[in-house]
Regions:
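Beta-sheet-dominated interaction scaffolds and their linkers
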Residues: 341-359
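Cysteine-dependent hydrolase recognition
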Residues: 1-335
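A eukaryote-biased signal for short, well-structured alpha-helical docking elements
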Residues: 235, 339-342
Length: 359
């Protein structure tokens, strides 16, 4: 059942031009595994009819047609098959933008394929930090010393940029439903018959996906999920990341930005050319810190951004442009004026003379 969940996601990603790297392991079948069926769990046929050849065609009719599964060495009772080395090397060499585990797990480990907190210090995926979807049991138990989630986050310049994981024992079928909800938030076309009707434009925001998936498991009635297991799942999964974290789902590109090199406070507008669909923000210093002035959507042509307030000369106008799968653009613009002005650096009040002195 773990495989049918994970491979339905891999199949979708392949259908949109991604190239997911799979490390799939047969789990504890004691040599009796058959590659002719996905699962013996109740209602497997409903899931297969939806994701398989008769439905969305993300997976074949049998796992044998897919292939690529690692098998344990039953004779020597070796279930690891050097899993931790395989997983570690994959993360180090090509971590991708999402690292997903769908299997059994516990406080400091993934079970099959095996990987644990003790392997995290050996990760060297510098400056290429994936977001981790750890969909299992208890791998996000932050009250337990050295849980896997904290290990992946705390290691310097390696591991993951954030993790979604549960804090204790979970229900497997509800986990599947939850994970499908996460991916339907990331990619709105993943489940065309289910999920949110709000267009997300494929913004990969894990903390928002976590919340959306919890609504998803209550809205949809996937097989073998129940009211109590939905509540359990909703309570246990947490997003260990910044609330507004956005992921790159492609190698990020530079944006071509053109704009005025200076800003005169008398103008009340600023000219800029930014890619269509980008978000343009302008801000400046204020007594309480940085203050947002205006936000606009880029058109791909030169456009004028209204600056609603008078800005003090010698301050800076900050221009920020963001767009999905593009590197953030930031520029500081000097604020000028053609008029005379007075700048107050500090002041002193003499209580004895009742004088206020400005410098």
């Amino acid at each position: 059942w773990f495989q049918i969940c994970a491979e339905s996601i891999n199949g979708y990603l392949s259908s949109i031009g991604k190239d997911p790297y799979r490390i799939s392991k047969i789990h504890y079948f004691q040599g009796n595994y058959s590659d002719s069926i996905w699962s013996t769990a109740d209602n497997t046929d409903q899931i297969l009819n939806y994701f398989g050849p008769n439905g969305l065609n993300y997976i074949p009719s049998t796992p044998g047609e897919l292939g690529g599964f690692l098998a344990p060495d039953y004779e020597n009772d070796d279930y690891s098959n050097y899993d931790d080395t395989i997983v570690r090397n994959a993360i180090n060499q090509n971590p991708g933008y999402v690292l997903m585990n769908r299997d059994h797990g516990w406080y400091s480990l993934w079970d099959c394929p095996a990987f644990g907190s003790e392997m995290v210090p050996m990760l060297t995926n510098h400056n290429k930090l994936p977001f981790v979807l750890s969909i299992n049991c208890a791998s996000g138990a932050f009250g337990n010393k050295n849980c896997l989630t904290e290990s992946l986050i705390k290691i310097e310049n390696a591991g993951g940029v954030g993790v979604i994981a549960p804090t204790f024992e979970t229900h497997t079928h509800s986990n599947d439903s939850y994970l499908w909800g996460v991916w339907d938030f990331f990619e709105n076309d993943f489940l065309p018959d289910y999920g949110t009707s709000v267009e997300n434009n494929n913004n990969y925001m894990p903390a928002f996906a976590n919340v959306s998936a919890k609504h998803f498991i209550y809205q949809q009635n996937f097989p073998n999920t129940y009211q109590n297991t939905r509540e359990l799942t909703s309570n246990l999964f947490h997003a260990h990341c910044d609330a507004f974290l956005k992921l790159y789902s492609e190698v990020p590109q530079q944006m071509n930005i053109e704009h005025d090199n200076s800003y005169y406070s008398e103008n009340k507008s600023f000219n800029i050319k930014a890619p269509a669909g980008s978000i343009i923000g302008s801000s400046t210093e204020d007594y309480d810190g940085i203050k947002t002035l205006a936000i606009a959507e880029g058109t791909g042509s030169m456009q004028s951004i209204n600056i609603p307030e008078h800005l003090n000369p010698e301050n800076n106008l900050y221009i920020t442009v963001t767009k999905t799968n593009h590197l953030r653009y930031e520029q500081s613009i000097e604020i000028k004026t053609d008029n005379a002005f007075v700048t107050m650096e500090d002041f002193f009040f003499d209580d004895n003379q009742h004088n206020l002195i400005f410098n």
